[in-house]
Curated annotation (Swiss-Prot):
UniProt-recorded name of the protein: Cytidine deaminase
CMP/dCMP-type deaminase domain sequence ranges: 47-167, 186-296
Binding site for Zn(2+): 101, 128, 131
SUBUNIT field: Homodimer.
Record key words, sorted: Hydrolase, Metal-binding, Zinc
Organism annotation: Shewanella woodyi (strain ATCC 51908 / MS32)
Residues at which substrate binds: 88-90
UniProt gene name: cdd
GO molecular function, one term: identical protein binding
Amino acid sequence: MQDRFIKCIAQLPKPLSDALIPLLNADFAGHIDAQQLGMLTTKSQLEESELLLALLPIAAALAKPPISEFYVGAIAKGKSGDIYMGANLELSGEALFHSVHAEQSAISHAWLSGETQILDVVVNFSPCGHCRQFMNEMVEGQKVVIHLPEQKAQPLAHYLPYAFGPSNLNITEPLLSKQQHELSLDSSDPMIIEALDHASLSYAPYSNSYAAVVLETKDGATYCGRYAENAAFNPSMLPMQMALSTMTRHNREFTEINRAVLIESAQGKISLVGATMDALHAVAAVELEHIVIDPA
């Protein structure tokens, strides 16, 4: 079991902790598939909603909040039945806008894993306005059920009434809808190919700045992030922050970053290169490889 879970596993009911410990191996990064979730439900003798709330200390253990020292964990349940954990991330000494919220982390985890709809979001503290707006961008966002400790489960519409969202800007394929933007680049570099694939799956209906980041560690592992825009603009999630959140979930240190690539479309109304370099240089002494490509 990873060291970061030792303290929180003691907070769980023993039947649950006994069933969960084998899953918390060196490769665990917050994903529990539907079959494993069913096993945990059976062995813990908890209802699924109770189980998800009980798992929040595990999700919160994925957090890296050096500024606030406030650990927030979130769990997103996808239409597939799988669950995806996420947690807040802050960049030490840097402006707060670089932060990733737990709900963003969990939802981006699900999105990177191929989920096309989130049914439930479970979180240990009430979602802030930023996160409510971020969740509202998703497919059927107003119907996502929010679960909080000692609170009745309620749809997002309860927490964000009279919402402004993608439909107000005539967007018919919101976040988590299948995206496939035609981007092409002649390269045999596996890392650039991976970044290109993720850029083609990014969500940027407002700026058309389709983009992705891939980070490579010294052992050759790669961690990616895609751009996820928001109708309210500010709650958009940048690909570098998503990639750093992915690294954190996998228990990797930013000092292990050996290479960083940003790919973005030349046809976008904005460029993410400045914000991407700021975040990268805050955590690693690596130069950003910036590639601008034309649509196919």
